[in-house]
């Protein structure tokens, strides 16, 4: 079994946060996340830049990247600027 990874993504949107969040919170997005065992933990908007979004997910290692590869075109139709996407990944290491 692969380890669980918490991924933090930031990116720009070309719509309002409310418009983007309605899509992110939709049944269609839930279905697409579920196919890759992705659990969204948080999504928010920058206080300084209303076009900058943060999303925190938890999923088996590599699944979020597979999701983005498989759904990049779908994401772009929702006015996500994929060229601005930045990611950091975090995991729990037992001592």
Protein language model features and the residues they cover:
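Glycine-rich beta-strand-turn "strand-cap" elements at beta-sheet edges
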Residues: 1-3, 36-52, 75-95
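Surface-exposed beta-strand edges and their flanking turn/coil or helix-capping segments
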Residues: 21-24, 35, 55-57, 68-70, ...
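Short amphipathic alpha-helical segments
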Residues: 15-41, 72-76
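Short, well-ordered beta-strand segments in beta-rich or mixed alpha/beta enzyme
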Residues: 5-12, 41-71
